[in-house]
Amino acid sequence: MTLRPMTLRSMTLRLAIADDIEALADLGRRAFVAKFGDLYSAANLAAFLAESHTPEKVARELADPGMAIAVIDEPGDPTGKTIGAFCKITYASTLPRHSDALAPFELKQLYTDPGLVGRGMGARLMDWALDQARKAGADELQLSVYADNPDAQRFYARYGLEKIADITFRVGDHIDPEILMAVRL
């Protein structure tokens, strides 16, 4: 079966609500493990997931006025309760400072259900993130991407993001090489 890209009309993009907390934590865990799980020891992976992809963490993020979370509901779910993809942005970047931007936004996470990759959800969420940053007066959108993830780097480059620095990212006790990417708005 060939998956076809979804049309913008068939995607329901909305802001996350409290009822989404469990689904966001679950999708975050599943997407991270599917893409990167084999890179880490069981202990490091478990520590990272317990720190970064729990309902408690998502609840704190959802309550944070400095963060916004958008979701796209999974197509064809009659309940409308299954999230196919999500994007988290912060209104002030927490990444290491490597640019002269005065008001940078940060794209924290953009995750798609592993079975739905390639259907346009990531593109729709990326458009949303850039739109939110521009509307709020940000002068730059920044993100961190794993150095050995060329597919993600190409995806972000389509939106004008370029490498501005080499940085690191911690997964448990493991330190990953990351690339700081940014685009001026």
Question: Would you name each region that the model predicts?
Answer:
Residues 1-22:
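Conserved N-terminal entry element of GNAT/NAT acetyltransferase domains
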Residues 113-115, 119, 147-148:
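Active-site acidic-Proline motif in GNAT/NAT acetyltransferases
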Residues 119, 136-139:
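Short coil/turn segments at alpha/beta junctions that flank glycine-rich nucleotide-binding fingerprints
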Residues 100-105, 139-142, 146-153, 157-185:
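C-terminal "cap" of GNAT-fold acetyltransferases
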Residues 15-19, 26-39, 46-115, 126-128, ...:
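Acetyl-CoA-dependent GNAT
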Residues 44-46, 147:
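Short histidine/acidic/glycine/proline-rich micro-motifs that form metal-
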